[in-house]
Amino acid sequence: MFSVIFPGQGSQIVGMGKEFYDKFDLVKKLFKEADETLNFSISKLIFEGPKEDLDLTINTQPAIFLISYSIFNVIKTEFNIDLNKAKYFAGHSLGEYSALSCAGYLNFSDTLKILRIRGGAMQNAVPKGQGGMVAVLGSTVETIEKILLENENNFKAQIANDNSEGQIVLSGKTDDLEKLMNVLKDNNIKNIKLPVSAPFHCSLMNNATKIMTEELNKLNFGNSENKLISNVTAEEIENSEDLKELLIKQIENRVRWRESVINMIDNNVNHFIEIGPGKVLSGLVKRINREVKIDTINNTEDIESLKI
């Protein structure tokens, strides 16, 4: 059995998706619709940059979704590979929106619009430079939670991403993260400050939660037979009525990616297909379980060799 997985931020590069755009009218139509939906040329930004503009969260989120959605539809329509046979659809952070759109719960234009709003809300939730994220390597969730508890009167930080065995990301205020990094260093735990301008997936995103609550409540989610795994619970979403609440909770809560992958494997998934730019999730899955099959779809050659 296979699962389809969709990447989040950090996978974007200028020029991504160009091969698909050049080869398939279907993709040209999707890019044109995206430009019209967003009232600016996201196509030009994706293909020409500049990189610093593509890296702005408000642009990155709809851009990565557009690439993932385009590739997904090329696989289905141009190569007649039925990805709806997937046991689960799942995505990392913004990738969860790619998953629910490709799985049939939210239409293309609504997903673009909500991700543009989400990107702006998350970027503006904390003044620039006042929050950030730190990656911790070679430790465990239990160890990090113990350190956070022991130092709760000294600094505040939250686990934002539980990505894989030995890769955890924390969010917090810049000053608190400096203190955290010193404590981690004292404990011989390797850590790296990430080049992001906001502390995603923690309580500092509260203003973004308010905006997204209002915006998500305006949307109509459809029904689908396809099963989704939630970032918030790492479990199957049993009822599509829970989608909005889980997407709202996702903004301030940790992305339980490691647990999500383990849960899918425990439910007989032995093949993961990553659809979108880069191969970040493929690397994480490999760290979690070396036995499973992984396909990363970045070009048409990858699709031609895909077997499900």
Residue ranges and their predicted role:
Residues 255-263:
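A short, well-structured juxtamembrane/interface segment
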